[in-house]
Amino acid sequence: MSEQTPHHCGSVAVIGRPNVGKSTLTNALVGAKVSIVSNRPQTTRHRLLGIATYPEGQLVLVDTPGLHKVQKRAMNRVMNRAARGSLEGVDAGLLVIEAGRWDEEDSLAFNVLRDAGIPVVLVVNKIDRLKEKGALLPFLQQVTEGRDFAAVHPISAQKRNGLEALVRDVLKLLPEAPPMFGEDEITDRSQRFLAGELVREQLMRQLGEELPYATTVEIERFTEDGNLLRIGAVIWVEREGQKAIVIGKGGARLKEIGAKSRLQMERLFGAKVFLETWVRVREGWSDDEAALKAFGYE
């Protein structure tokens, strides 16, 4: 590494309201699936690190649950705490918003970053979904007026448009430092944690509107047998009726959830996976702080 090309490295919080594409952006920058995604808000429930390594530097991305104003249930409060706690010790923040939309929760996310006293890059995601391309510039002017951003980047995380320029600008905000992680490392989370998240992703994708929010996944068994991973996953719900829905007629839905989860695990872990799944009931777990702690929520 020459003196003309210093290496930059630091922590970058990825903040925004639910469902703006924070996890899709994290995965795109890392170049691997470290954070689950779905079309439903609040898919991300845990703080995790995504490690994006480039010749010029390393971004340690702190992917967070979406910040939301309503905190009626314990789960919502826990996720908001995780999002706010992610700002401790970070060097910069990415405020991710959806092109054409700015509301109270976007303002909340901006205020949280501003109060942290770190440089903030505005990332305007989903520009490919704008029906009128001419509406982008007036929207950017509206959002940036009276708000201090270190840089503004319209992007499409899903299509990977605009990411190179974003990375260049974010690296400039980070200190000159050697990498914190090795080149092959992509996250601070264990395979056991990621396995549970991949099962939960399928629950978010395959179940109805409300039911995914009443489910969580606990990995009871994770063992290596040569090139075979043996994984046992418990899907927790809050009522017997929900259990029947997750299992489906003749066990069809649970079988589909398991099959798709297994394929995702094999792709991510680079190994064959033998996956068993069970569905169990723990009443009211999502509004019970003790239960949330037992299931690994921070």
Curated annotation (Swiss-Prot):
Residues 8-176 form the Era-type G domain. The keyword Ubl conjugation does not apply. Residues 155-157 are annotated as: G5. It holds the Pfam family KH_2. Residues 16-23 are annotated as: G1. Keywords: Cell inner membrane, Cell membrane, Cytoplasm, GTP-binding, Membrane, Nucleotide-binding, Ribosome biogenesis, RNA-binding, rRNA-binding. PROSITE patterns: G_ERA, KH_TYPE_2. GTP binds at residues 16-23, 63-67, 125-128. Residues 63-66 are annotated as: G3. GO terms for molecular function: GTP binding; GTPase activity; ribosomal small subunit binding; small ribosomal subunit rRNA binding. One of its GO terms (biological process) is ribosomal small subunit assembly. The keyword Nucleotide-binding applies. Belongs to the TRAFAC class TrmE-Era-EngA-EngB-Septin-like GTPase superfamily. Era GTPase family. An essential GTPase that binds both GDP and GTP, with rapid nucleotide exchange. Plays a role in 16S rRNA processing and 30S ribosomal subunit biogenesis and possibly also in cell cycle regulation and energy metabolism. Monomer. This is GTPase Era.
